[in-house]
């Protein structure tokens, strides 16, 4: 079982694997999940009213328990940090891409991504995290 220390870094990996240019996993939909449970309201409003600064529980549960094989992780060559990433929409539909809700706090999981070559949107990472990535030879693209 692959465990990530930093949930937000795992979300960036999921973005690449599930919603990126060449998805390797079937995209997951919060709306479809809630609709299957009988929800028929406005998802954006429901999210804003009930989970203002939180990941929706269904998304948290799904993404936390999502198994990512070593083979999938070895295929990751880039990560994208952008407030408009689909994984964030699935986690928190009303999120406007601003704020610290999805900031990566730790790179302790980088050993899980042995072929990571570049990080897009690196300016959104803390300076120390940027320095750590550079020290590992990873190209940062703002």
Where are the regions that the model predicts?
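N-terminal low-complexity, Pro/Thr/Ser-rich intrinsically disordered segments
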Residues: 1-2
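LRR N-terminal entry segment and analogous cap-like coil->beta motifs
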Residues: 5-10, 14, 18-124
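Leucine-rich solenoid repeat scaffolds
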Residues: 114-142
């Amino acid at each position: 079982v692959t465990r990530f220390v930093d949930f937000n870094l795992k979300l960036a990996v999921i973005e690449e694997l599930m919603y990126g240019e060449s998805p390797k996993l079937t995209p997951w939909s919060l709306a479809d999940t809630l609709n299957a449970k009988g929800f028929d309201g406005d998802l954006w409003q429901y999210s804003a009213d009930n989970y203002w600064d939180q990941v929706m529980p269904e998304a948290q549960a799904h993404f936390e328990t999502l198994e990512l094989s070593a083979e999938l992780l070895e295929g990751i060559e880039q990560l994208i940090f952008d407030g408009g990433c689909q994984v964030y929409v699935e986690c928190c539909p009303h999120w406007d891409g601003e704020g610290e809700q999805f900031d990566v706090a730790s790179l302790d999981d980088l050993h899980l991504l042995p072929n990571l070559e570049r990080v897009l949107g690196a300016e959104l990472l803390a300076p120390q995290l940027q320095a750590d990535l550079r020290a590992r030879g990873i190209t940062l693209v703002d």
